[in-house]
Amino acid sequence: DKEFSTYKEVYAREKYIDFLSHGITEYMVDANRYGLPLKDKERLGGLFHVVIDVERIGDHAVNIMDDALKEKNQKIEFSKEGRDEMLTMYGKVMDIYEKAVEIFVNEDKSKFDEVDRLEDVIDQMKIDCQEGHVKRMAAGKCSIESGLVFTDLVIGYERIADHAVNIAFSILPEKKIN
């Protein structure tokens, strides 16, 4: 069915990201053996961290897909409020990811403030989602099982945002590392 097809696609992309990550890392290690100017060595070091961040985003995407499948297969129900919170957070994470990639690809520092602001919003959303979920559980609106999946999803989204910020700020000589 469609969900399984999506899972296979996400998993295949993650395997491809792992393959590329390995090859790119090998190339960068080889390139670093040559007498590169200091500026180039620093840039190469920054790119190495970007490769790691992209690979970790792929890992989180697979984890999120696993949680989504668990939700479906175990017939876990989220409250409307919880589902709305997750969808809102997902949208913000996609925004920060797209802006981070744009900053990195175009070396455009003009969007740093926007990425910083979005990171703060996402960090607060994680806290708000977790607190809201605890309140919903206490009120009997959702189960412990849904809580575990909900928490994993929210944490996964927030970690993707952190890696996206690292990618954006990698174009600076002094980086903001999350």
Spans of model-derived segments:
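Cytosolic, long alpha-helical scaffolding segments
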Residues: 1-178
